[in-house]
Regions:
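Structured catalytic-domain cores with a bias toward divalent-metal coordination
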Residues: 1-132
Length: 132
């Protein structure tokens, strides 16, 4: 199991956030690659708990040579939201100054996807590890 810490610059001077990535299983491009993430909605913690326990099971499977896929796991995908606590309550999905919900107001990507072959090409690129 390989653990990688990814540093993301914060939006104010001197701040940064960490994402942890785990790569588990054979590094064989012919095998399926499975991406798992949890904690995108920072206040929703059951997925993080599941991945916490799954990591131990996958590590045991890797050590015994039983895994037939490569797993890429981000057990907590929203470090900004996880760090937002006010008055002893988790505020994870709201921008503290504006009150905007981080889980809403996303760009409409339909046009871009339609012009570039839809999700099929995106999925193929993600599974192949291509950065194009």
């Amino acid at each position: 199991m390989k653990r990688t810490e990814i540093t993301i610059a914060g939006d104010s001077p001197g701040t940064s956030h960490q994402l942890t990535r785990f790569d588990i299983g054979p590094d064989d491009p012919t095998l399926p690659k499975i991406f798992l993430q949890a904690g995108l909605h920072a206040g929703e913690q059951p997925g993080m708990m599941i991945l916490h326990h799954l990591l131990a099971m996958l590590e045991a499977g890797e050590q015994s040579g039983r895994l037939r896929a490569r797993f890429v796991i981000f057990p907590m995908s929203n470090p900004i939201g996880m760090g937002q606590v006010g008055l002893h309550h988790h505020q994870g999905r709201y921008h503290l100054r504006s009150g905007l919900n981080f889980n809403r107001g996303w760009f409409d990507l339909f046009e871009m996807l339609a012009e570039n072959g839809g999700l099929t090409n995106l999925a193929a690129a993600l599974l192949s590890g291509s950065s194009d």
